[in-house]
Amino acid sequence: MATLAVYPGSFDPLTNGHVDIILRGARLFDRIIVAILVNAEKAPLFTMAERVDIARAVFKDTPSVEVDTFEGLLVDYVGRRGAQVIVRGLRAVSDFEFEFQMTLMNQRLNRQIETVFMMPDEKYTYISSRLIKEVFALGGQVHGLVPDMVEDRLRDKRAMRV
């Protein structure tokens, strides 16, 4: 049986830390779905269509990576897709408590789904989408922290605000 994994997140924006986890996950699992969360409570920098477009473009040459969207409970989505594994990235100890709680709740909701934690390459351990958005909003450079396409789209957004 092929192993299907789901890597969920808002990916607003997609960072090189995310890309690192996804590409390494693609080597570990037969297929990995980048599942972009629809969250009506957040005001995203990029629209859902933009985030999907970016992710599909970044992984266009990696056939084992699929990009999809979901809303609602992650374990319900994972079950509907027939996946066996949730992939989560851990950058620092500060991520662990939240991820630990989420994993325990997911296990309670569906014992058939496993969670695998992956550490990003050390050069990406401090990068988060929130930090990228903050640096961008204050006029800072994010080169090397996000895929080139994300950097271009950020520049476009900055130009539209001027």
Residue ranges and their predicted role:
Residues 1-162:
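Nucleotidyltransferase catalytic core that binds NTPs
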